[in-house]
Amino acid sequence: IGRVVYDGITDLANAGVFGEYTFHAGETFTAIAGLRGDWFYGEGFKVSPRVTLKYMPVDEIVIRANGGRGLRYSTPLVDNIGVLSTGKMFTGSYKEHILEDAWTFGGNITYYLPFGASSNTYVSFDFFRTQFAQQMVVDYEQAMNVISFYALDGRQSYTDNYQIDFSVDPVERFNITATFRYTNAKIELDGKGLVEKPMTSQYKGVLNLQYATNLNRWIFD
């Protein structure tokens, strides 16, 4: 098995500037438009736009939508620290730092319900998609004892997240929150086509019970 040596020196550097504009139409509509420009060492100048919209048709309903571009240098072994415990050999670009490029867009609808001991009773639905234009691929399926690292380079990769949340205070200072999320993550591996992204959990659920004493001196979860 090959030995990975890290000397603590990288050539990662970037500098950027960011600006945004906020528009309000009373208390029912808000729009925030942002634009970021970054210079990345070895990659040049990149622009990352983003927008956030919020609309309240009535007091009980809040609708949000947002989207934008994200850029970051990959750090393959740090981002996938679990591979170090597999005992497998690494091949490909595991020492390189490609510039990952992704677009994320989606929205949320929150409905505040007219019951419970506080105004914090609600149900919300979320959907977000992340579409990768460039990504560091970690391929566990090239060979039995090998993990291969390589750039996406025109292949497909995306993640869809669907989430539902419910929160209620049945009595004062006692909160119940339940969350369920479904993740559909697909990636196109070299020679295998579009497959489920390895090491990704499709279903996640959380149930949290919280009680707080007077003045929140003690909080129990």
Language model features with spans:
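Membrane-embedded beta-barrel scaffold of Gram-negative outer-membrane proteins
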Residues: 56, 62-64, 98-153, 158
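Residue-level signature of outer-membrane beta-barrel architecture
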Residues: 21-23, 37, 45, 55, ...
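Gram-negative outer-membrane beta-barrel transporters
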Residues: 24-28, 123, 128-131, 152-221
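Outer-membrane beta-barrel translocator domains and adjoining extracellular loop/strand segments
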Residues: 1-5, 43-49, 76-82, 89-91, ...
